Regions:
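Alpha-helical recognition segments enriched in aromatics with Gly/Pro capping
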Residues: 1-32, 47, 118-328
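N-terminal, positively charged nucleic-acid-binding surface of large information/translation enzymes
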Residues: 8-11, 17-105, 481-485
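Alpha-helix C-terminal capping/helix-coil junction sites
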Residues: 54, 100, 128-129, 254, ...
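Short phosphate-binding/catalytic loops that engage adenosine nucleotides
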Residues: 58, 132, 474
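Short, glycine/charge-rich beta-strand/loop segments that flank catalytic centers
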Residues: 66-71, 92-95, 105-120, 138-147
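The substrate-binding groove and active-site-proximal loops of carbohydrate-active enzymes
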Residues: 77-84, 108-114, 198, 226
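Structural preference for alpha-helix termini/caps and helix-kink/transition segments
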Residues: 275-488
């Protein structure tokens, strides 16, 4: 398995620190508002990466934090006349709920920053003792960037270049404009905790570094997030951890590409800003995932509702193909053509191999789905050519490949067959002489009666059956695998 490191800008063979096990951390949200679809793209991407690692036989421990104390939360609380804790609790719960709606698996560990103050203070004390951090008179504590000889390696930045763009303020209390806060002295009305430097709260970068160390140990195998976090957040996390514990922080850094909307950067001022919650009110999570995974996780993703509608249509085609394959297996007639069946079996094997090869090549979901859609065409061609005389084992294997591929991507296919209404039994008794009490058998009887009427060119009877089914919210669908009754 090859994984691209955004630190080295190269793919390399993935070798976990502990054979067969993966320790993985992805930065969670700052919980002051509903997450937008750009955030969702990152979380869905790493959900699929996690799923593929598990499917590949790894034991994965996945941690993701909730940043529940931060300037943004405090500002939102002040705007609304609420406490920071109330805002953080509301949007923490909303985040967890919408992630589940998006079929993102819960993390194994979900630490909240406000519950981890002790480990953060311990890390800051260690950094001060080792000369990598310093407290100032007002109670702030800063990390000395120049004390870390490796600073800039995660994001590819150079300290001299950073100095050119650094803001140098009057009465600067920091020793160096590049230094960043590990601990912020308390301000009136803000959440704060006791520390050796007085009341205050941790800096954002400090939170993640301390939580990774506590719950996963360092170094970890994979640290991920959106590309906007590479600098300064991930750079500063790594600097603290490396200097505090004298070990590498993460063996592989992974970052997702930006999300655009109709080719433009998403922003509220342009009116193209969408939360995940509002998108999922009108569209399925499965279609959204399918749309997002048709672009490689590192590439920019151009989102549009037209493309999302297209993904809904593709999803229906996928589900319909799987349904047709299973239906054909259950209703096979005649002697199957061995050569045709072998061609289908070969297509399954080839698509399966290509899907796996793409996923093992830096989780290339776009390539994997390309192979997958090629197979969907092959499967439908087989059903057309077989004309009901299918090889049951071959078509079931094909359906299983479709379902397995979607499952590993976290894409839940629409219900394959809605339960037929009980009224269809009386209709079949009236129109087809059916005497049983099974809805599926009743549907078969009506299909047979309709086919018989059409063969006799008795269009009035055939149309009457069609119309009566329509009144029950049903339709007869003619497929390559044969006719069947389904909900409209």
């Amino acid at each position: 398995m090859q994984i691209y490191s955004s630190q080295t800008h190269k793919k390399a063979e993935f070798e976990p620190i502990e054979p067969g096990k993966v320790r993985m951390y992805v930065c969670g949200p700052t919980v002051y508002d509903n997450i937008h679809i750009g955030n969702a793209r990152t979380f869905i991407s790493f959900d699929v990466i996690r799923r593929w690692l598990i499917a590949s036989g790894y034991e994965v421990t996945f941690a993701q934090n909730l940043t529940d104390v931060d300037d943004k939360i405090i500002n939102r609380a002040n705007e609304q006349g609420r406490t920071a804790a109330e805002v953080a609790t509301e949007f923490s719960n909303k985040f967890i709920d919408v992630m589940r709606r998006a079929n993102v698996i819960d993390p194994d560990v979900r630490p909240r920053a406000t519950k981890e103050i002790g480990p953060m203070i311990a890390m800051i004390k260690t950094l001060i003792e080792q000369g990598h951090a310093y407290a100032v008179e007002n109670g702030d504590v800063y990390f000395s960037v120049r004390s870390d000889e490796t600073y800039g390696e995660v994001s590819g930045r150079n300290i001299d270049d950073l100095m050119v763009g650094a803001r140098i303020e009057e009465n600067e209390i920091k020793r160096d404009p590049l230094d960043f806060a590990l601990w912020k002295a308390a301000k009136p009305g803000e959440p704060s905790w006791k520390s050796p430097w007085g009341e205050g709260r941790p800096g954002w970068h400090t939170e993640c570094a301390a939580m990774v160390h506590r719950y996963l140990g360092v170094p970890i195998d994979i640290h991920g997030g959106g590309s906007d976090l590479a600098f300064p957040h991930h750079e500063n996390e790594c600097a603290q951890a490396t200097c505090a514990w004298h070990q590498g922080f993460s063996n592989t850094w992974m970052h997702t590409g930006m999300l655009l909307v109709n080719g433009e950067k998403m922003s509220k001022s342009l009116g193209n800003f969408f939360t995940l919650e509002e998108v999922l009110e009108k569209h399925s999570a499965a279609a959204l995932r399918l749309l997002m995974l048709q672009t490689h996780y590192r590439s920019p993703l151009d989102f549009s509702f037209e493309r999302l509608e297209g993904a809904e249509s593709s999803l229906a085609r996928i589900a319909g193909t799987a349904q047709n394959l299973r239906w054909a297996a259950a209703h096979a007639t005649g002697e199957p053509d061995a050569a045709l069946a072998q061609k289908l079996a070969d297509a399954v094997a080839a698509a399966d191999a290509e899907f796996k090869a793409c996923m093992d090549d830096d989780f290339n979901t776009a390539g994997a789905l390309g192979a997958f859609f090629g197979f969907i065409t092959e499967a439908n061609s087989y059903l057309d050519a077989a004309d009901g005389a299918v090889d049951a084992e071959a078509v079931v294997t094909a359906a299983e490949f479709i379902e397995r591929s979607m499952d590993v991507l976290g894409i839940e296919l629409p219900e394959q067959e809605a339960e037929l209404p009980v009224e269809i039994i009386a209709l079949a008794a009236e129109r087809a002489g059916y005497v049983g009490d099974d809805t599926a058998e009743a549907a078969e009887a009506l299909i047979a009666a309709r086919a018989e009427a059409r063969a006799a060119k008795d269009w009035a009877v055939a149309d009457a059956i069609r119309d009566a089914l329509g009144e029950l919210g049903l339709v007869v669908e003619d497929t390559a695998a044969g006719a069947r009754v389904k909900a409209k």
